[in-house]
Amino acid sequence: MIVGVGIDVVDVARFLAALDRSPRLRDRLFTPEERDLVGGSLAARFAAKEAIAKALGAPGGMRWHDATVARVPGGAPAVSLRGTVLAVADGLGITSWHLSLSHDAGIASAIAVAER
């Protein structure tokens, strides 16, 4: 059963410009596993974190490091949760996540579907 759906889009150039203006922003938004990504891939990871938050109803107290978006063997995106995001997901009975990320023509997008 679908518990929540979230979607987000990011203007890649604006996002990267924000990271350039504030070098500490990369550390605040991304876990160490995500920080080496560049360009559209990094913007898509941010869009995924936003989409995950929206699928959960944008819980208060969420920290950006509460969700790590990585690739599993074969290339599909997967999410690892901790902290507030994990507590909210557990409280909603979420047992699986489906993510889709894309970036093209200067736009990065992500959709997150939470299921129980």
Swiss-Prot record:
Keywords of this entry: Cytoplasm, Fatty acid biosynthesis, Fatty acid metabolism, Lipid biosynthesis, Lipid metabolism, Magnesium, Metal-binding, Transferase
Top-rank taxon: Bacteria
Cofactor: Mg(2+)
Disulfides per UniProt: none
Binding sites annotated in the UniProt record for Mg(2+): 8, 50
Annotated Gene Ontology cellular component terms: cytoplasm
EC number from the UniProt entry: 2.7.8.7
Subcellular locations according to the entry: Cytoplasm
NCBIfam families, per database record: acpS, pantethn_trn, PRK00070.3-2
Described purpose of this protein according to its UniProt entry: Transfers the 4'-phosphopantetheine moiety from coenzyme A to a Ser of acyl-carrier-protein.
Protein name in UniProt: Holo-[acyl-carrier-protein] synthase
Recorded name of the encoding gene: acpS
